[in-house]
Amino acid sequence: DEQARILRTLLQNNRKRELEQASFTLLYSGMSLAALTHLTRHRMQALCAPDLLENADYNRFVLPESVRKAGMESRYREAFSIAEAAARKLSSMSAGKDALSYLLVSGLKVPVVSTMNAGELYTFFRLRTCERAQWEIRELATEALKVLRAAHPALFSLYGPTCFMTGACPEGRMCCGKTAQVREKFSGTL
């Protein structure tokens, strides 16, 4: 239809300025500090995260499947308990935030609100839904894309990893080797 044709034309432009007029706000209710570092690399966004030291909850963390499969879940949980005990001890000694910040473990979960325009989301989804992206940010980005596709299918059905959007993988020798499966996945409903 005409709307889809116009959107495809916009996505083929190098500048994509028209896409900057539409903004979308997403809530990530439990993103690890590790994934947050990937999100903050996208400079064209308004990002709201709580004060990490005041809101650190050492009982809310991401448990990677690789840790579980390695049989290291109890040791992993213990690391958070040790970090929490050290943070309490330093706090009781009136340690400054500069010292306490070193005890923030990358797996801690925080709620994050991000607002990006459709142009920045184009870049975000191309990079972060790729099989080569860090696993957690890839899962969060794929879920965000699923939500946006449900709300705005005409535009966001065209978004996804680069191989889906252009038909070619930009990773060269580092390609995941699953281009056909990835393209099929993103051609569907996710």
What function would you assign to each model-found segment?
Residues 1-190:
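Family-specific signature for flavin-dependent thymidylate synthase
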